Amino acid sequence: MLVLCGLLPVAVSAKTLDEQYPAPWIKADNPSITRAFSEADIDGCGKYRYRVSSGSKSEFLVYCTHGGRVTQAFMVWPNIHKLMGPYPPDPSLP
């Protein structure tokens, strides 16, 4: 796995990133995620796709996109106003 996995709580659970955040990618806007980016003054993530954690429906792996290309990754917990990143996207996730 890429550096992203080493920096995330995923490493503790011994699950792969794909198991922790199973497909599919959701491409629709999520007001909670959008608000979390706004509150954290994150630029460059106006368009994104995300996966919901298998362990918590309020935890998301978010990939920011620009021009159809993934540029950066974040962990987002909107319910507790927490955001971690940016991280490089993991190329093993389709």
List PLM regions with ranges:
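Bacterial N-terminal signal peptides
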Residues: 1-9
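N-terminal processing/targeting junctions
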Residues: 8-13, 43, 83
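Short, non-transmembrane alpha-helical segments in secretory-pathway proteins
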Residues: 14-49
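Exposed beta-strand-loop-beta-strand "reactive/processing" segments of non-cytosolic proteins
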Residues: 44-76
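A short, surface-exposed interaction/processing loop segment used at functional sites
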Residues: 75-94
